[in-house]
A protein has these predicted regions:
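RNA-interacting cores
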Residues: 1-287
Length: 287
């Protein structure tokens, strides 16, 4: 029998995490930044087992003095995770997390097709190119979609912001048409990845920033990858229950092992919960 999926909450001392990572030179990025996702990737793997708490999301409320909550989906309950950490984790790892306060709840195992849910996801909406892509004239430095690329072409295999890819692939005669929006491009990107599992009925780009990610290089050391960091909020309808369960467990998109791609579920807003699916048929088509 397959173990139930659990939602895990683990309190994290963000200051202690930064010190722990600094001693190991983990998460440092070009320009002196710090990628807490890579630090947490290593900390969680060494404390609970590789890939066990994944996907995950770290939430740090303002004014909490560096105390955060890490949420993750896992096929192991809190008691078993605590037992594993006490057996194998070094003492310095347990100074970063509050192991006694680790908590869990079992997730439903019988999702109903058509059920409406609110969601929030921190995503890295990128596309890996299957062929080279030119940056295009006038799309390098400045404030345009390709700002910061220096006008250089992208090579096959490059990981590129989905919004930038969409902007560069637009037909020349589309210049006078409706301008692309980052929100609509990212909504389409998410809809593609949830196809079959869920249908998006509303999507909002709640926040966006550029994010410098520290990742293992081909040789010893690390490389810095710049990319989008988007917080998407909205509502969905469950499609295939098994596919939806898998989307929760595995996460959505790339960099799922580093703090991206976790679907956190929320209540549907009361006004929208009262609507019939047919009332929003046209709205779904826009996402």
């Amino acid at each position: 029998m397959t173990a139930a999926l659990h939602l895990i909450r683990l309190p994290v001392d963000v200051g202690a995490l930064s010190r722990w990572a600094g001693e190991r030179r983990l998460g440092l990025t070009d320009g002196g930044g710090f990628d807490d996702g890579r630090a947490l990737h290593h900390l969680l793997s060494e404390t609970f087992g590789k890939g066990r708490l994944q996907p995950f999301r770290l939430l740090v409320p303002p004014g909490r003095g560096g105390r955060g909550s890490l949420y993750a989906y896992c096929r192991t309950d809190a008691a078993a995770l605590r037992e594993e950490a006490l057996a194998v984790a070094p003492p310095e790892h347990l100074n970063v997390v509050d192991l006694p306060a680790l908590a869990d709840k079992p997730m439903p195992g019988d999702w109903r097709a058509g059920r409406r849910l609110g969601f929030e996801i921190r995503a890295r909406p990128v596309r890996r190119l299957l062929a080279p892509l030119a940056a295009g004239p006038g799309n390098g430095p400045g404030n345009g979609p390709a700002a910061g690329t220096g006008g250089r072409p992208f090579a096959k295999g490059d990981e590129v912001d989905a919004f930038l890819v969409a902007a560069l692939r637009r037909l020349p005669d589309a210049d006078g048409g409706t301008a692309l929006s980052r929100e609509s491009v990212y909504a389409g990107w998410l809809a593609e990845r949830l196809a079959g599992a869920a249908t998006l009925t509303a999507v909002r780009l709640a926040s966006f920033r550029r994010h410098a990610a520290s990742r293992k290089g081909n040789r010893r050391g690390a490389v810095t990858l710049d990319g989008p960091d988007a917080l998407l909020q909205g509502e969905l309808e469950v499609g295939d229950p098994d596919a939806f369960r898998l989307a929760l467990e595995k996460g959505v998109g790339r960099h799922r092992a580093y703090g991206f791609g976790m679907l956190l579920l929320r209540p549907v807003s009361p006004d929208r919960a009262a609507e019939r699916p047919a009332d929003r048929a046209g709205e779904r088509g826009g996402c």
